[in-house]
């Protein structure tokens, strides 16, 4: 190796060390001073914790574990945000809220941000500001591992004899017929009953959220199977009050670093714990975002 090359590498290492040292001495109050005077970013940093609206009854997104601790993918995203704000992922205050309160609690200032499996739509974006998505939801088919209709190919081959349960709504039939045009559709009143119809073998598959399929297969692989089909993509994002670009930029940065950068331990562990999968490997070079 040439002397010039060695000197360059030494300078590079020194630069990294200086950068790390500079980052470590930038305290929270100095960071807060950089935000616009009216930005929630300054308020949150001065307060010392972030107030997050979420739920507690919908696994794998937000629910209580056996010890009564609030966990789930949404909850992990809140801890990721706290880690970015304070270098301490525990500095979160959760406000448990009904889904109908997600937008009102943002606009009234009851919460700093809502992280509660919220689907991005243009209509909602007129009321709140959405962060970058942290998950792409979809529809998938939950099946039984011992069934002759376990895979999507088998369900397709069943034609008009294939029976699928789905939560009752105006688009239910069309949602199933997008991928199984001949299937018999059984619309049912609750998600629990949609799955119970599969358990009792009244249907061959249950059309539910992709995250639900992944969670149930991860938890009980001897009881449930994933047919291998997913469709109808929907974005899940956090939501915050409109008009606060500093706060929105910061949340997006914290999420980007956790999902695409070097601080991905929390996100990756949650993705594996709740969905049974590992995110795609991050590779240096061309940015994947």
Predicted regions located by residue number:
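Extended ligand-binding regions for polar small-molecule ligands
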Residues: 35, 80, 84, 161-162, ...
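Short helix-initiation/N-cap motifs at beta->coil->alpha
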Residues: 37, 92-104, 186-196, 234
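N-terminal secretory signal peptides and thylakoid transit peptides that target proteins
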Residues: 1-16, 28
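Periplasmic-binding protein-like
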Residues: 56, 136-146, 210-255, 275-289
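C-terminal segment of N-terminal export signals and the immediately downstream linker at the start
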Residues: 1, 24-47
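A ligand-binding cleft/hinge motif common to bilobed small-molecule-binding domains
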Residues: 101, 117-127, 175-178, 199-233
């Amino acid at each position: 190796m040439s002397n010039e090359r060695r000197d360059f590498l030494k300078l590079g290492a020194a630069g990294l060390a200086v950068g790390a040292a500079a980052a470590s001495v930038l305290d929270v109050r100095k960071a807060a001073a950089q935000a616009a005077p009216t930005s929630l970013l300054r308020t949150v940093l001065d307060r010392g914790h972030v107030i997050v609206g979420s739920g507690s009854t919908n696994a794998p997104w937000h629910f209580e574990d056996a010890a009564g601790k609030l966990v789930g993918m949404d909850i992990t995203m809140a801890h990721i945000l706290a880690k970015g704000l304070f270098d301490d992922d525990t500095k979160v205050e959760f406000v448990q809220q009904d889904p109908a309160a997600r937008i009102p609690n943002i606009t009234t200032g009851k919460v700093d941000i809502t992280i509660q499996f919220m689907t991005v739509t243009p209509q909602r974006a007129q009321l709140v500001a959405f962060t970058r998505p942290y998950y792409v939801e979809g529809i998938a088919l939950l099946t039984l591992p011992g069934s002759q209709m376990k895979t999507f190919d088998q369900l397709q081959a069943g034609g008009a004899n294939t029976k699928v349960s789905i939560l009752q709504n105006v688009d239910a039939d069309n949602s199933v017929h997008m991928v199984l045009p001949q299937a018999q559709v059984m619309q049912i009143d609750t998600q629990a009953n949609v799955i119970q119809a599969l358990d009792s073998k009244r249907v061959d598959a249950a059309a539910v959220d992709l995250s639900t399929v992944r969670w149930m297969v991860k938890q009980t692989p001897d009881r449930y199977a994933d047919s291998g089909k997913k469709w109808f993509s929907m974005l899940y994002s956090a939501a915050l009050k409109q008009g606060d670009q500093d706060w929105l930029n910061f949340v997006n940065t914290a999420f980007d670093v956790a999902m695409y950068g070097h601080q991905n331990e929390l996100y990756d562990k949650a993705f594996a714990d709740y969905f049974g999968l590992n995110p795609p490997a991050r590779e240096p070079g061309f940015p994947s975002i």
